[in-house]
Amino acid sequence: ISINQDLKAITDMLLTEQIRERQRYLADLRQRLLEK
Protein backbone atom coordinates (compact mmCIF):
# COMPACT_ATOMS: atom_id res chain seq x y z
CA ILE A 1 0.00 0.00 0.00
CA SER A 2 1.39 3.39 -0.95
CA ILE A 3 1.54 6.32 1.45
CA ASN A 4 -0.95 8.24 -0.71
CA GLN A 5 -3.53 5.46 -0.35
CA ASP A 6 -3.02 5.46 3.41
CA LEU A 7 -3.49 9.22 3.59
CA LYS A 8 -6.65 9.04 1.48
CA ALA A 9 -8.08 6.28 3.67
CA ILE A 10 -7.31 8.24 6.84
CA THR A 11 -8.81 11.42 5.37
CA ASP A 12 -11.98 9.55 4.35
CA MET A 13 -12.29 8.07 7.84
CA LEU A 14 -11.87 11.47 9.48
CA LEU A 15 -14.45 13.06 7.19
CA THR A 16 -16.91 10.26 7.86
CA GLU A 17 -16.35 10.68 11.59
CA GLN A 18 -16.89 14.45 11.38
CA ILE A 19 -20.13 13.96 9.46
CA ARG A 20 -21.37 11.46 12.06
CA GLU A 21 -20.50 13.84 14.91
CA ARG A 22 -22.35 16.68 13.18
CA GLN A 23 -25.42 14.51 12.58
CA ARG A 24 -25.42 13.42 16.23
CA TYR A 25 -25.10 17.05 17.33
CA LEU A 26 -27.94 18.20 15.07
CA ALA A 27 -30.21 15.36 16.20
CA ASP A 28 -29.47 16.25 19.82
CA LEU A 29 -30.16 19.93 19.16
CA ARG A 30 -33.44 19.16 17.39
CA GLN A 31 -34.52 16.93 20.26
CA ARG A 32 -33.87 19.72 22.77
CA LEU A 33 -35.82 22.21 20.67
CA LEU A 34 -38.76 19.81 20.44
CA GLU A 35 -38.81 19.31 24.20
CA LYS A 36 -39.31 23.02 24.94
Swiss-Prot record:
Residue numbers of Lysine amide PTMs: K36
Compartment list: Secreted
Chief subcellular location: secreted
A GO cellular component entry from the record: extracellular region
GO BP terms: neuropeptide signaling pathway
Highest taxon, organism lineage: Eukaryota
Keywords: Amidation, Hormone, Neuropeptide, Secreted
GO molecular function, one term: hormone activity
Entry similarity comment: Belongs to the molluscan ELH family.
Function: ELH acts as a neurotransmitter locally, upon neurons of the abdominal ganglion and as a hormone by diffusing into the circulating hemolymph and modulating the activity of other organs. It specifically causes contraction of smooth muscle in the ovotestis and expulsion of the egg string.
Protein name as annotated: Egg-laying hormone
Species, as recorded: Aplysia fasciata (Mottled sea hare)
